[in-house]
Structure formats: structure tokens, C-alpha cells
Amino acid sequence: MARLVDLDKVRNIGIMAHIDAGKTTTTERILYYTGRLHRMGEVHDGGATMDWMDQEKERGITITSAATTCFWMPKFGNYIGVNHRINIIDTPGHVDFTVEVERSLRVLDGAVALFCAVGGVEPQSETVWRQANKYGVPRIAYINKMDRTGANFFETVKAIRERLGANPVPLQIPIGEGEIFAGFVDLIRMKGIIYNKEDGSTYDEVEIPHDLQNEARTWRINMLEAVSEHDDTLLEKYLNGEDITESEVRNVLRQATLKVTIIPVLCGSSFKNKGVQFMLDAVVEYLASPVDVGAVEGHHPRTEEPVTREPKDEEPFAALAFKIATDPFVGKLTFFRVYSGVLKAGSYVLNTMTGKKERIGRVLQMHSNKREDIDCVYCGDIAAAVGLKDVRTGDTLCDENSPVVLEKMVFPEPVIEIAIEPKTKSDSDRLGMSLAKLAEEDPTFKVKTDDETGQTLIAGMGELHLEILVDRLKREFKVEANVGKPQVAYRETIRKSVEFEGKFVRQSGGKGQFGLVVLRVEPLEEGKGYEFVDAVKGGVIPREYIPAVNAGVQQAMKSGVVAGFPMQDIKVTLLDGKYHEVDSSEMAFKIAGSIGFKGGAKKADPVLLEPIMKVEVVTPDEYLGDVMGDLSSRRGHIEGMGQRAGAQFVNAKVPLSAMFGYSTDLRSMSQGRANYSMEFDCYREVPRSIAEALQEKRTSKDSD
């Protein structure tokens, strides 16, 4: 199958937003207008195409990043009538699913940031925005739900500037808001667009309504000033009062958008079919193609030398696996983004993370949960492979003759865990395998066994995250399980640096064991994890035993010295040691490393840490006092408050341990009128009284 469009006519985009901003409906409309759908689904009736898991249809939220492809010919702008391929990843808006957002942003070249014209910039908008900044993803902003009572386009633009620190530049201003939203003024062409009242998919082009002419002129001047700052030629023309063409404005806007120095802003109401076609024109006009993004950087798996791959079909094949999913019909699906070269179905690829070669049986182009077999996939495309057994999220797939490791994705550690046990013997046999499959799909979901109780523990990013995974066990894997109460994932660290000797000796006839190490144990800054440095001089410990010391330290870190929780943010330096010609072994040095670390950590002022959550509560005025009092009673620290969309909002940092059951308490406190969102912020030291209680619990467990 030949390439359908040139590479510069490809757009890999994501739809990113807060929950309820209208992402799934907007994506449905895109598919409808681009000819992929013949009937539009609605989220509220569970018929939306991109929400393809049962739980998504029931809950009306998007959990997995469904991928789809479609084609669009712009009606206006520099690309009129030129066919473009748009690959869309629909990302979730609930904070428990930030991993889905993170991995989709890693492989995108641009994004449409959706905002609700009533709610404005919500907490999850900020979270997703920060993630997009991290990857330098160019964005356009689409202010949706303009037909809703309380819609305010200009307030939302102001909030994008103030809360996100962005530079939003409206290319349209609305004609009417709320129930009287009728269309918009195109500030580049200085024309009015009035949508058909019965069906917003058709519209009339008119002169700008008389009562909006002054406002439109003001906003056009604002737009031209903002755009001309990014191009000297345009600035000179603007200052000299010369005419500036549409094409010139669009060209400079495109360059500024690609550098993320301008965010073009559009408006619409996807549910009423208003604005989506113009948003598609803007996707083509202003967002990046793989050619604009340029070469991808990586390194050679053996030599660590830097390697670059140009976005060309002629280059050796290189792709990043960004998502693993289990499909009930075809089995394991590996979604991947091709950065260079071409891949044919049936060919072999090298996974440079495992060093293994695997055959790709089939290549599928995904349309939400429907799939289409294709012969080959080209540079810049997103597709799914069937038949890859050992691939994990973030692995690089490439041509075995030109190996490369692309940048590895980094995911946050889980903050909440629950015990899980099978209901029956047959469930018991399948539970382990099913949990392993789910963990393979989701890097923020971890499965482990409690060493003391033998219980299986599952850990994730929040209560909803784990609830949905347990639900999937039942629906997809037919495994019934009982779950315990959620537990906080406490951690331990140290506050000062110490040196300590770890010695393991067993010499009582026959071959003995001997290993002696001197370690320096010191704190690292928060979030750095673990670092091991070998500073041994003069061969006092043979090279082959040093990895064993590191392994012993890491083993000891899994169960801390305060209350048995995993330790983090620690640097361990191996300074000195001794070995015995006959009795030393890897095992002896592993145990010596473990003893040395435990002894050092106990003297290094060890402390207990707890996860602190960033919480935002939106509440009617009359419940504000109760909400703030309640947050304070949960050891919360109020960080700010204000007014938004006719309600009060409160920002606070609260320990996760105090937030279990909060949704029920908030509902009863506000008669169901307040809502909240919560995301992990950082780990902080636990107050002494709580630390003592946890230590006591640990001691009583040990004595049992």
C-alpha cells in the first residue's frame, strides 16, 4: 500500500482537557466530519466511538487513549483543498489516568487543548498543560460549550493566560454567548460566520454584525500585535501601517505556534456541531507535521553514542511503543509511533530494551476499537502491532542492522495500594496472570506480595484507578476478587550522611562466607530515587563482587528501618572493603551490602514520608466555610482561593491518608453541589505522633 499523503501533510494530535470539557464529543464530531463515522455517538447515551471500554461507556469518562486516523481538506487558509492525514489520540481527563496522557503526549506532534467556556481552566487542565510543556508540544486552544448558560469566552482566555502562564491569541471572537451563541468573527479574514440554527454543521458567511465591529477591530489589533512580535518583516509592515495579507499572518502564526510562544484560540460548541470544522482547519494550519518536529534523538544500545533519525521513509526503521492493550479478539496489541523508515507486516524488529528480535505478525490501523489490517506503516504514522510478546511501554522497536534506543518514558510511582485476594480456587489460578497482563499495559500499576502476610497487593495512582482495574479483572479476565481497604504507600528516607561497615562472616569448617564493605549513606534531593557509586580503590574488592553489593543495598531498601516501608532518595557510595581468597562470594557481599546499608540508615536520622495531594474543591459560597474547616481538620494546608464560574474554589495540600472517603463527606457537606479533584504532589515527613503510631503497628505485627 503506497503512502496516501506526503509526510508534511500528516498531523499527529491529541485532544487534551479536563474531565467534562467535551473531549469525547469533540472527537466524535471530528470523525463524523472527516467521514469516518456515519452516526454521531454521545457520551451521555454511552454511544461514543472513542470510549470503547465498558467502564468508559458506563462512567462517561475516557480512560484509555484510543487512537484513530482520518483525513481532512481545509476550507480556509494556506492549505485549501489539500488532503491531510490526522492521527488522533483521545486522552483521559481524570487525574488518576495521567499516565495515559503522559505516554500519548510523548508521541504527539501537536494538541488541541479543550476548555469549557463555563468552567474555564480546571485543575486537570493545569496538570495536562504542564505535561505538554514538558514535551514541548505545540497547542491550539478550543473553547468549547459556548452554548451553555454562563459561558464566557474572554474570561476563559484570561484564565489561560493567568493560570497556565501561556500566551493565548484569539483568532475568533464569539457572536453571542450561552443560548444566543450564533457563530464567530474570523479576525484574520474579518468576516462573520453564522451557524444554521437547526444544524450547526452548515453556516453562512456574513459581514461582521454592527454591534461587534469595534470589538472585532480591537481584538484584530491585539492579534496582529501579538503575531508581529514574532517576525521582523511583519512588525515593520504593521508599524508602517502597510496592509498585511492573510497568508502572512497565518505563516507567522504557524511558526510561533510551533515554538509554543503563541496559543491560537478558537471557540465552538461541539455538541451543537458548531466550530469543529474550523478547528480542523486550524489543526492543519498551525500544528506540526513530523517534518516540522525534525530528527529524533537517541543513543546506540551498546556504545551509548548519540544517534539521530531523520523523519524520512528512506531512513532505517525506528519506532516507540507507547501503549500496550489487551484486545479480546486479537490478543496483545502494541501501539507504536514510527519516527523513521517503513515497516512491513510480517517483518522482524529489534527491541533494543530487551535485545530480542520479534516478528510483527499483523499491522493494524486503529479506528477507536475497530481495526483495519494494513500491509505497511510509514514514517510519521501511528499503528498497532499484533504478535509482540516481550514489548513494554516505552521500548524502542527498530531495524536490527541500525539499532537505536529512543528516550525512555518516565512514569510516577503509585501512591495508594490495596490487598486483593481471589474469591475461589479457579479465580486464584487466573489472578496472577491477569494482574501481570494489566501491569504490562499500565506502568503506574504495580503488583507485589507482602513479605509478612503473603497477601497480594496492587498499587496505583488513586482509588478510581484501582477500582477500574479490579472491574477489568472481572469483565475481561472473568476473575472475581475481594479487595481490602485502600492503604497509603508510605516511604522512608534519611536526613544525614553516615559511614558504616557491613560485615558478613561465616567460617566454621569447610567453605565459609566472607564479605566486608564500608558504605557512605547520604540523602539525595526529593525525587532522585537511588544512586550507587563505586569508589573502591586498589582492588580491595574484586570487580565481580561490586554489583552484588549494589543488589544487597537495593534489597535492604525495599523494607526500611523506621516502619518497614520502601526507602527512597538515597545515595550509597562503596568506599572500602575486604575479601577472602577462598571464602568470599557474591552472596557474602550481597548480605554485607544489606547489613551495611541497614546499619548506616539507622544512624542517618531516618524519617517516615507520606504522599501529599494537591486538592482543589469547587463549592457554592454557602458551603465555603465548612469546606475550609473540613480540609484543615484533615491536616490540610490552604494555599489559595478565589471565584470561578459563579462558585468558590479552594486549593489545598492534604495528606493522602486523610482523603479516603472524602467524596462522600463532601457530598453530604454540600448537598451534592460541590466537587473536587486531587493529584499527587510530593512526599513529606510524617508528623511525629502519626509516625509513632505506624511504628507501633509495625512492632505489634512483628511480635505476632
From Swiss-Prot:
Sequence ranges assigned to domain tr-type G in this UniProt record: 8-291
Localization per record: Cytoplasm
Binding site for GTP: 17-24, 90-94, 144-147
GO molecular function, one term: GTP binding
Keywords: Cytoplasm, Elongation factor, GTP-binding, Nucleotide-binding, Protein biosynthesis
A Gene Ontology cellular-component term: cytoplasm
Pfam families found in the cross-reference section: EFG_C, EFG_III, EFG_IV, GTP_EFTU, GTP_EFTU_D2
Superkingdom as given in the UniProt entry: Bacteria
GO biological process: ribosome disassembly
Stated family: Belongs to the TRAFAC class translation factor GTPase superfamily. Classic translation factor GTPase family. EF-G/EF-2 subfamily.
Task of the protein: Catalyzes the GTP-dependent ribosomal translocation step during translation elongation. During this step, the ribosome changes from the pre-translocational (PRE) to the post-translocational (POST) state as the newly formed A-site-bound peptidyl-tRNA and P-site-bound deacylated tRNA move to the P and E sites, respectively. Catalyzes the coordinated movement of the two tRNA molecules, the mRNA and conformational changes in the ribosome.
Name assigned to this protein: Elongation factor G
Record organism: Pelodictyon phaeoclathratiforme (strain DSM 5477 / BU-1)
